[in-house]
Amino acid sequence: GFVLSYPPSTPWERVRDATLELLSPTRCVACECPGSLVCDACAARIVTIDPVFACLRCGAPFGSLLCTECQSESSQDDQVANNCLAACVFEGVPARIVRAYKDGGERRLAAWIAHALFDAVHRAQKAVPKRMDAFALDADAVVFVPATPAAYRRRGFDHMEAVAREFSNLMGIPVLDALAKWDACDQRKLGRGGRLANAADAYDVVEPVAGMRLLLIDDVITTGATMAAAS
């Protein structure tokens, strides 16, 4: 599930974290209850996606075939994400977690998000093993959707690189910094057409990955434009 804790790995980290905890106690990023980054009550409210009843292309929780959005784009395969797996619905608690991590400076959530992704893979391996055989079980490496240079400067770190490194440790496969992303406008306020146009040709492959089976991860999938362009 999503109730997780991550003890520091070195004596220095334990001293540092204990001092920080005294000065500024950890609070739940969703409800501000003291004690943990995500409290048990908020974790219990997270709506996970059952892969058995998810769109085969984008992973949305709208049935076991193609959702209506993917059906409408079925003739434009180059612009649509394919064979995606989503951990949970991006609303309520998960939305607060991602915002606290990306824009609120709570970098400790990288491990939490990585565990959520790993939990989704584990559930899918049990529920839809044939589908998972297609990419997860034999993956050679993890690749992450990189931040734009502007987003990196604003946040001071690449949020998905940190998640990818945690996730790759859980999966037992290496992480590759294989993609470079050029500056583009923020997609959060764009519609479907705008997202597709914005994402097109936004990425370059900067590592030799030909012939490899890769797990591409990102924090949020809306229209699938980013995942399609990056893949």
Positions of predicted regions on the chain:
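Glycine-rich phosphate/pyrophosphate-handling loop used in enzymes and phosphotransfer proteins
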Residues: G1-S231
